[in-house]
């Protein structure tokens, strides 16, 4: 039994089912109709700050519960529905950098992770294959990663204008990895 089939729950469910185990995932909330998500509506900012807020204390939908964050410097980013908080990240799927695991050593903040990027790298690659991450391998701003199964999401008009501007200025840009199957 797995409570929550978002990114982590789905990965655990896949690994257990692959080993021959029967798996049941339970969700708090229902399916979200992608056509009702307000990103392409004129009043999207209103929805993002009310019924689609990442903070359940603001959202207050029937499936939500309050989270006491008064002693925390951060507010929760969570969503109670099938897919969990992945609903908020729009399938944008960047990887950590090796330096993200050493923030105490490099920047003097927080704590270093007890593991390194390179120890996790094979699991990053396996997860990318399971999820079907679309993109192009070879971005020099990131460590080497496995080839992507499908091509990146095509650039829209705004992205094309930005890419031309970046090229003109000699700035680096790269199509983002996305957890979306771009090939039927």
Which positions does each model-derived feature cover?
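N-terminal glycine-rich phosphate/pyrophosphate-binding loop and immediately adjacent elements
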Residues: 1-105, 109, 114-118, 122-125
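Conserved redox-cofactor binding core of oxidoreductases
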Residues: 49, 65, 92-95, 104-184
């Amino acid at each position: 039994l797995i409570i929550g089939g978002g990114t982590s729950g789905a990965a655990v469910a896949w690994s257990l089912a692959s080993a021959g185990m029967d798996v049941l995932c339970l969700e708090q909330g229902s399916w979200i109709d992608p056509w009702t998500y307000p990103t392409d509506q004129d009043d999207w900012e209103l929805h993002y700050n009310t019924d689609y807020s990442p903070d359940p204390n603001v959202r207050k939908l029937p499936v939500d519960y309050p989270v006491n964050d008064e002693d925390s410097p951060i507010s929760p980013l969570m969503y109670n529905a099938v897919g969990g908080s992945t609903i908020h990240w729009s399938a944008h799927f960047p990887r950590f950098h090796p330096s993200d695991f050493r923030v105490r050593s490099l920047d003097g903040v927080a704590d270093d992770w007890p593991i390194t990027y390179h120890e996790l790298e094979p699991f990053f690659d396996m997860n990318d294959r399971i999820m079907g991450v679309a993109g192009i391998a070879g971005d020099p701003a990131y460590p080497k990663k496995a080839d992507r199964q499908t091509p990146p999401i095509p650039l829209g008009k705004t992205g094309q204008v930005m890419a031309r501007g970046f090229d003109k200025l000699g700035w680096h840009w790269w199509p983002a990895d996305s957890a979306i199957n771009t090939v039927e």
